[in-house]
Amino acid sequence: MQEIIASVDHIKFDLEIAVEQQLGAQPLPFPGMDKSGAAVCEFFLKAACGKGGMCPFRHISGEKTVVCKHWLRGLCKKGDQCEFLHEYDMTKMPECYFYSKFGECSNKECPFLHIDPESKIKDCPWYDRGFCKHGPLCRHRHTRRVICVNYLVGFCPEGPSCKFMHPRFELPMGTTEQPPLPQQTQPPTKRAPQVIGVMQSQNSSAGNRGPRPLEQVTCYKCGEKGHYANRCTKGHLAFLSGQ
């Protein structure tokens, strides 16, 4: 009734004009400050903001579908450059880790999304093609459908809206199903005769190396020659007494 008798839709207050044009908005002291509680910059949405990183309002670019989990804890350092949403929206919260991992969550007021595991299972492309070797152990969904006879003949007038199944004979090429790349066979490289001689001499010297004679062995416990430290009978403090 008030809109009929005295409509004020055509009246625009000075405060509304000041808010739309961001009059009196001072630039930030330094870039990179937290602007999570500020409003969205209207000029940035129109690609007309000249303040850049010093703008006191938020610069939101693109469609962000998931809330930033670090912003919820006040730990996000990316600010407007974050690829996730800095806004508390229950419909865009990330998935609950405990519910997705264990199938249950003990927090009755959990702010994260509890997604049904059945809804995340995709249809098996092999089963839709006709046969899946994994059978009931397949991690994908096996759904029985009635094949469209018209589609098998060659053409279905219903198209995608047909209530029967239109089988797809092509398979998605996953990362694990890609054919192995052919390995390049390189011819054996020929080594110089000098290098071969050095390597043979090193191998022969290493193969002929045996235990050193006891005359060259010095015991680190007593300091005498002729036996190893594990065979010393004078004790580990014999070098202090000079015995």
From Swiss-Prot:
Belongs to the CPSF4/YTH1 family. The modification Phosphoserine is found at residue 241. GO terms for cellular component: mRNA cleavage and polyadenylation specificity factor complex. Component of the cleavage and polyadenylation specificity factor (CPSF) complex, composed of CPSF1, CPSF2, CPSF3, CPSF4 and FIP1L1. Interacts with FIP1L1. It is found in: Nucleus. PROSITE patterns: ZF_C3H1 (PS50103), ZF_CCHC (PS50158). A zinc finger (C3H1-type) spans 35-61, 62-89, 90-117, 118-142, 143-169. This is Cleavage and polyadenylation specificity factor subunit 4. It comes from the Eukaryota. One of its GO terms (molecular function) is RNA binding. Signal peptide: none annotated. One of its GO terms (biological process) is mRNA processing. Component of the cleavage and polyadenylation specificity factor (CPSF) complex that play a key role in pre-mRNA 3'-end formation, recognizing the AAUAAA signal sequence and interacting with poly(A) polymerase and other factors to bring about cleavage and poly(A) addition. CPSF4 binds RNA polymers with a preference for poly(U). Gene3D superfamilies: Zinc finger, CCCH-type, Zinc finger, CCHC-type. It holds the Pfam family zf-CCHC. The keyword Nucleus applies. InterPro entries: CPSF4/Yth1, Znf-CCCH_3, Znf_CCCH, Znf_CCCH_sf, Znf_CCHC, Znf_CCHC_sf. It comes from Rattus norvegicus. A zinc finger (CCHC-type) spans 217-234. The keyword Transferase does not apply. Keywords: Metal-binding, mRNA processing, Nucleus, Phosphoprotein, Repeat, RNA-binding, Zinc, Zinc-finger.
